[in-house]
Amino acid sequence: YWTYNIVMDTPLKQKAEFRLGQIVSHSKFRYRGVIVDADPYFQGTEEWYENVAKSKPAKNKPWYHVLVHGQGNETYVAEGNLLSDENTDPIDHPFIEVFFNEYDNSGSYSLKQNFN
């Protein structure tokens, strides 16, 4: 992934720690999920950040869209709040088949198409 210098709008070589289709867990809330999209830096509103992101994670690092296991929702999570999930069980979410072709039994799904 590429991130951009917000002031100069120039590409920086900053690699995201997680990849699309990877199963992760939230370090604070302990839920599991799968990454369906990634932003090179926070792209939400300032209001959302102030009201929802209580721990005030870094805005200039990657943020991820995660389908939450066992629920029908998606979360927007800072890279610093995610961990690789050691549990390789598949994710149960109603939109899994919308984004992914198959699960490889090692903690990763293959994308149907490139959404990013």
In which residue ranges do the predicted regions lie?
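Mixed-charge, Lys/Arg-rich low-complexity intrinsically disordered regions
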Residues: 2-23, 29-32, 39-42, 113-116
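Intrinsically disordered, low-complexity, charged/polar segments
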Residues: 57-116
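Short, solvent-exposed secondary-structure boundary/capping segments
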Residues: 42-51
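Aromatic side chains
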Residues: 18, 31, 48-49, 64, ...
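Structured beta-strand/turn binding interfaces of compact recognition modules in eukaryotic regulators
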Residues: 27, 36, 69
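Short proline/glycine-enriched turn/loop segments at secondary-structure junctions
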Residues: 51-57
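Short, glycine/acidic-enriched capping/hinge loops at junctions between secondary-structure elements
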Residues: 36-37, 46
